[in-house]
């Protein structure tokens, strides 16, 4: 393509040209099915292979063990702001939140709207979110700590994640997921709206430690339970097939063309 524009939008963000070319080549006839990826059944073998490959590549790239589920959930990261307290802050549970900008502020608001027990233990609002708080006094009895890894609007990022004294971190990584290796065992959940870094809008990658699924109250509506997606390989209802397929191709590019997250971090 002669005049491809450099795209610095925060989302939908740029995608690798080779991924777009592969999509173009296979768009009308996906894997010899005679149908487009936008037409095939999400119950088909072809799409089942897409999901399973995306899950496997996510696990390899991040070094995830079998105690993590990899899910594709709709609603972007913004819906997760609502789902996280709904799923993990049942009666008797509490969480610490760190406020570092627009997206963490929205996550805090969604928890507060539900009347959940949360504490904002640190904030950089006093200087217009121009820094990442240090020396945070986390509550040892908190069930999780919520962070936003990269604050696109304010331009700050956690270069190193804080010591939470063993409390699992739940982290919005929408704009820097797959950009660097992570100490994944420190996290209870990582989530990322695909359109920021790994695909088009429509899918949210959710990586969740399996034991957290046991925290979910029975009263949470079916489509707002992470356990619903885990039990059905992200296909309880019709998923955003095209978005998931594109994410799969980006993960393939990261693994096979770039050579993994160490290499990606070096490029970045």
Per-segment meaning from a language model:
Residues 170, 184-195, 204:
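Conserved active-site segment immediately N-terminal to the catalytic lysine
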Residues 89-105:
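Conserved PLP-anchoring active-site segment centered on the Schiff-base-forming lysine
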Residues 7-9, 70-74, 97, 119-122, ...:
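General beta-strand structural signal in soluble alpha/beta enzymes
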Residues 4-55:
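A glycine-/small-polar-enriched, mobile loop at the entrance of the PLP active site in fold-type I
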Residues 194-267:
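Active-site C-terminal subdomain of aminotransferase-like
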Residues 111, 123-177:
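Active-site phosphate-binding strand-loop segment of PLP-dependent enzymes
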Residues 33-80, 87, 102, 110:
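Conserved N-terminal alpha-helix of the aminotransferase class I/II PLP-enzyme fold
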